[in-house]
Regions:
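Conserved beta-propeller blade repeats
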Residues: 35-49, 83-102, 127-145, 179-185, ...
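Short glycine/acidic-enriched loop and turn motifs that connect beta-strands
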Residues: 55-59, 105-108, 149-152, 243-246, ...
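A detector of repeated loop/turn-to-beta-strand junctions in beta-rich toroidal repeat architectures
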Residues: 64-66, 108-110, 189-191, 252-254, ...
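Predominantly five- to eight-bladed beta-propeller fold
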Residues: 64-65, 144-201, 206-209, 239-242, ...
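Beta-strand-rich domains and repeat architectures in extracellular enzymes and scaffolds
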Residues: 29-65
């Protein structure tokens, strides 16, 4: 029953073979110097790919995003910067092969069109900043979205923000008050505006969203995937959650259809579903609208089922109802007979093909985390893929599932770094259910390895076989640590029942899984030093550090707690997306069922705390406000427990700025080395 698998061995061996004799440990600076792919746009003839390939300017503490082109017809071709697009962004191919992009003119982004081999032409003269755009395949319609007050057109909105008081006070009479890392501007929403293209310029304008009050795309993370424009430019489909007093407790995004010329109000196509409906995606033949839906209202981690709506009849069917995985991105194949999607499966996130007629799902790619999938005319796709070993590169898969690497943009830097080995394992977790985990070890290390026991956030999530520029498992192993992580009950990629099992059980089965998983890993691998471990986690993982401090206080030499919940009662009233904390505790507000929150409340067990803890938080974190971190630190200091507090005034729930990230790793490594010993790596001659 218990299985011990060495997966990703090919990738690990390849890295070892490429590593020079004088390899060195990876650093946080190395991580930030990696080139990062933007979403690729493929030319209609399939011969070229257009994308950003960003780099870090440490002196300016920011990333640059130059646009590159790759010749897909030439094996071994390397991405080349497009000189004509210097300073531009959001570049994409149109159906006619021309390149559309945004570029600043007198301090404000404008839309340009550049035919291949021709000169760019400015199409717009926007009087206000926009957030994004789409161009119809016919080229006769452009839609843009932008944060605007209630105003009928973009130009009016530029001068119609509400007059402000001479005082500095923000005034609200309903939530949201703040969202993610931003104080909400009352009356301002992300709205869609549509322009007819006349003589190569943007002409007649209309507001597509009509009198709807809500953000489209949704905030804080929605983008162009939530908006679709028909090929003929006549119809717009978009996801929107109607704003109101209950918005912070509602996950009810709906799909609306509206004429692009604003001639009639939007129509709600998914009014019957109180859960989330999003990612409207039109088939190439224009007959079918695909989208993903979650059935349960108030639950942001319900299964993503692909729905198909016949646009002529309105008939809708659940294509993947019988497939127990959640669809990520959704892309139509050119023949409209299948969909290419991404979905997590046991720590991997490959590309899958879904047959539209039967709903049959076939895996197309191997291990790693795929994204940015674009279907190709030969039945395959071009996509980005990363792994725990390396960041994104561009790949191609054909209709038979044969994968070809198209780029290797970080090869030179990766070749300098110490190799690592990655291994997945399964064990009997809580209730003897099958639970998965992984270990990552520096291949050159000898002797016993201290353990960095990393707990993922979400809690509905998975670190898995993927690259992160925040919690990077390969980097965490660099000083000579064995990184161990467990996909406890509640994790994603194992079926919906497993994901659901954490609801109302935050400190129950997950903690039991962590205990059993660490015991299994150390019993299976004698190189792991079971008596020398530190635990680390952020968000739910940070909550788990606070929970471990009181409920498993003798196991670890130190804890690293980032943006974790300390007091469930305060969290219930301080966080902004109320649907999350309410669903996780049985679907009720704190005042309706205090016992559900107090059952798993770390603050109730502070008297048992004794493990040294590093606490990290960001002042702009409105998801788990920084006051939760201050409270943890106060408890530690009041009890005389060795502790340290790091506060980033300019970061949110994530640490994103390069120098802040480097400081984060310096503090984390310093804390672990203090309690687990000095730099432990020992090199072979």
């Amino acid at each position: 029953m218990i299985k011990h698998l060495a997966l990703a061995a090919v990738a690990a061996s390849a890295l070892v073979a490429a590593t020079p004799a004088l390899a060195r440990p990876m650093t946080a600076t190395d991580m930030h110097m990696m080139h990062r792919f933007g979403s690729p746009s493929i030319s209609p003839d399939g011969r070229r790919a257009l994308f950003t390939l960003s780099n870090t300017d440490l002196a300016k503490n920011k990333r640059n995003n130059p646009i590159h082109m790759l010749d897909l017809t030439r094996p071994g071709a390397t991405p080349q910067p497009v000189a004509a697009l210097k300073g531009a962004h959001d570049a994409m191919f149109g159906a006619d092969g021309a390149i559309y992009y945004l570029s600043p003119v007198r301090g404000r982004d404008q839309l340009f069109r550049m035919p291949m081999g021709g000169a760019p032409v400015q199409m717009s003269d926007f009087g206000a900043d926009i957030s994004g755009y789409k161009v119809s395949a016919s080229g006769n319609r452009v839609i843009v979205w932008a944060d605007r007050p209630d105003c009928p057109d973009l130009a009016c909105a530029a001068t119609s923000f509400p007059a402000k008081s001479a005082g500095s006070g923000r005034v609200y009479d309903q939530m949201f008050v703040r969202h993610w890392d931003t104080w909400v501007e009352p009356g301002t929403k992300s709205r869609i505006y549509s322009f007819a293209v006349i003589g190569g310029k943007l002409g007649r304008e209309a507001r597509v969203t009509g009198n709807l009050i809500g953000d489209t795309p949704s905030k804080p993370f929605g983008g162009g995937e939530e908006i679709a424009l028909s090929a003929d430019g006549r119809m717009v489909y978009f996801a929107l959650r109607e704003a109101g007093r209950i918005e912070p407790s509602s996950t009810n995004l709906d799909i609306f259809a509206a004429p692009a010329d604003g001639s009639s109000p939007p129509v709600n196509l998914t009014d019957a579903n109180d859960g989330t409906d999003t990612q409207p995606t039109l088939s190439p033949d224009g007959r079918t609208l695909a989208y993903v839906a979650m059935a349960r209202a108030g639950y942001e981690s319900d299964r993503h089922v692909i729905m198909l709506r016949d646009l002529a009849t309105g008939r809708t069917r659940a294509l993947t109802q019988n497939w127990d995985r959640s669809a990520g991105s959704v892309t139509w194949a050119p023949d409209s007979r299948s969909l290419l999607i991404t979905a997590q499966d046991v720590m991997e996130a490959p590309v899958w093909r879904v047959d539209v007629a039967s709903g049959q799902v076939v895996r197309m790619t191997g291990n790693g985390s795929a994204g940015n999938v674009t279907a190709t005319r030969d039945g395959g796709a071009i996509f980005t893929q990363n792994s725990i070993m390396a960041p994104d590169d561009l790949f191609r898969v054909d209709a038979r599932g044969r994968v070809t690497r198209l780029t290797d943009v970080n090869r030179a830097l990766l070749a300098q770094l110490d190799p690592v080995s990655f291994e997945k394992f399964a064990f009997a977790g809580a209730n003897d259910a099958r639970v998965w985990g992984f270990k990552l070890k520096p291949t050159l290390a000898r002797g016993k390895l201290p353990i960095a026991f990393v707990v993922h956030g979400g809690p509905q999530g998975s670190f898995g076989n993927g690259w992160s520029y925040r919690w990077n498992s390969r980097l965490l192993s660099a000083p000579g640590y064995a990184v161990v992580s467990i996909d406890f009950h509640g994790s994603t990629g194992y079926g919906q029942a497993f994901t659901d099992s954490i609801t109302n059980d935050w400190g129950g089965k997950p903690l039991e899984d962590l205990k059993r998983g660490l015991a299994f890993a150390t019993a299976q691998d004698p190189q792991l030093d079971a008596n020398n471990a530190c635990a680390l986690g952020a968000s739910y993982g940070g909550y788990m550090m606070n929970w471990i401090a009181g409920r498993w206080p003798d196991r670890f030499k130190c804890l690293v707690q980032h943006d974790g919940v300390f007091d469930q009662r305060a969290m219930a009233y301080e966080t902004e997306e109320l649907w999350f904390t309410e669903w996780e505790h049985g679907g009720k507000a704190y005042y309706e069922d205090p016992a559900a929150y107090e059952r798993w409340n770390p603050v109730n067990h502070v008297a048992q705390w004794k493990t040294p803890m590093l606490v990290i938080t960001g002042e702009k974190d409105f998801r788990i406000p920084y006051t939760q971190g201050l409270a943890s630190f106060t408890a530690l200091q009041r009890r005389g427990i060795p502790s340290k507090l790091v506060v980033f005034p300019d970061e949110n729930h994530w640490v994103l700025k390069p120098h802040n990230s480097i400081q984060w790793y310096d503090e984390v490594f310093g804390w672990m080395n203090r309690w687990m010993g000095a730099q432990p790596i020992m090199r072979k001659n």
